[in-house]
Design a protein with these regions (language model features):
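Bacterial N-terminal signal peptides that target proteins for export
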Residues: 1-14
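Short sequence/structural segments immediately N-terminal
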Residues: 22-383, 391-394
Length: 395
């Protein structure tokens, strides 16, 4: 029985998480009383486990800490046992330990390098919370902060010839804004691209495959484009060359041009053979954006004037959607399908403009009618007042 209980080990893999109180240090030393207090909120405690599930009892009520190099195997003793784990949740994965051994961390730990991450560094040791708990270090909004405890520390990274800048770079990216500002937990964080238990940097040739997990259409268009063979021949990473890796900023339409040192201008000037195509696509996007902005402004004015402009709003949404498609179509590196997408968007924007103009014209018509009616009523009241005055005078 004790052997079975011991198997559960640190279910941080399973329900993945760690106590926020341990976030200051990856694996701090705690007293027995502190550990017991933390353990009251632990997923293992909720499952009926006790200290001896992970610890050998040393003296009295004191427990020996597991050897650092043995922690992954200790956790894996439960988390690779499918028949044991399914009693807690039949859908839980049981391949975390084998995956860890394929990771950069796991390969180093098997060589005796103890400065790399083990289970308790990310999930904690006591007070482990569910991965669905927003307080957990491995909850999506906290993952980058957890990774940064090591990967933003030059003292930890320098011995491995690794930069300590990726966490800061990611924090300024569109992905970080989506995750941290809009609380979009589907937005990518460290583990989305690098993996969690099998964490490793994607190889150059695999970067596009990672990005394609979310950016499906962009990847498909690029693979069919003339740039694909060129990038392969130069061993250039597909997505990273233009978008970077961690510090991915929001793309701008101005990238489709020859100004500055980003986008097309990073490699080309306007003397290239396809310059006219690039300029044409850029004009199509600029015209579409201008039409969308004008329609949005006029529809807003009509709406504030009390007009119902549902059709115009629907057309404006369609125009905005087509602009998104047109921007994605840049990855085809050809005049089409961007021009078609932009043309469809422009048509919708023009419908929105027409609806807005009709509504504004109706507003003016009503105002003129109101003005005429007001003048008529005012004239009537003045005439009536004069008539009453004459009657009062006996005239």
């Amino acid at each position: 029985m004790k052997m079975r209980v011991r198997l559960l080990a640190v279910s941080g893999w399973l329900l993945g998480t760690a106590a926020a109180v341990l976030a200051q240090s990856p694996n701090p030393s705690v007293t027995a009383d502190q550990a017991r207090a933390l353990f009251q909120n632990d997923v293992h405690q909720a499952a009926g486990l006790t200290c001896t599930a992970c610890h050998d009892q040393a003296k009295g009520d004191q427990y020996a800490a597991p050897a650092r190099a043995g922690i992954p195997k200790l956790c894996g003793s439960c988390h690779t046992n499918a028949s044991y784990m399914k009693q807690f949740n039949p859908q839980l994965r049981v391949d975390q330990y084998p995956r860890y051994l394929t990771s950069t961390h796991g390969k180093q730990i098997t060589k005796g390098e103890l400065r790399v991450a083990v289970c308790s560094d990310c999930h904690g040791a006591h007070g482990i919370l569910s991965v669905k708990d927003p307080r957990a270090p491995v909850y999506p909004t906290n993952v980058a902060k957890t990774c940064a405890r090591c990967h933003a520390d030059p003292a930890r990274m320098t011995p491995f010839n690794k930069p300590a800048t990726p966490p800061e770079e990611w924090s300024q990216s569109v992905h970080a804004k989506a995750l941290l500002e809009r609380n979009d937990t589907s937005a990518p964080t460290c583990s989305t691209c690098h993996g969690s238990h099998g964490a490793a940097p994607p190889d150059v040739e695999n970067v596009a495959l990672v990005c394609a997990q979310c950016h499906v259409r962009e990847a498909d268009l690029f693979r069919k484009s003339p740039k694909k063979k060129l990038f392969d021949s130069l061993a250039m990473p597909e997505c990273v060359t233009c978008h970077s890796n961690h510090h991915i900023v929001e793309p701008q339409d101005s990238w489709l041009g020859f100004e500055g040192d980003i986008g097309c201008a990073k490699c080309h000037d306007d003397s290239i053979g396809g310059a006219d195509v690039i300029k044409g696509d850029r004009k199509a996007l600029d015209d579409l954006s201008a039409a969308i902005a004008a329609a949005s402004d006029r529809l807003g004015r009509a709406e504030r004037a009390g007009m119902i402009i549902d059709d115009g709003r629907a057309a404006l949404r369609e125009a905005s959607d087509q602009r998104v498609l047109a921007r994605v179509s840049m990855h085809a590196f050809a005049a089409q399908p961007l021009a078609d997408d932009a043309a469809k968007g422009l048509k919708s924007a023009q419908l929105a403009l027409a609806d807005a103009d009709a509504a504004l014209a109706e507003v003016q018509y009503r105002r003129k009618g109101l003005a005429v009616a007001t003048i008529f009523i005012a004239g009537f009241l003045v005439t009536l007042g004069l008539k009453i005055r004459r009657l009062n005078r006996g005239e």
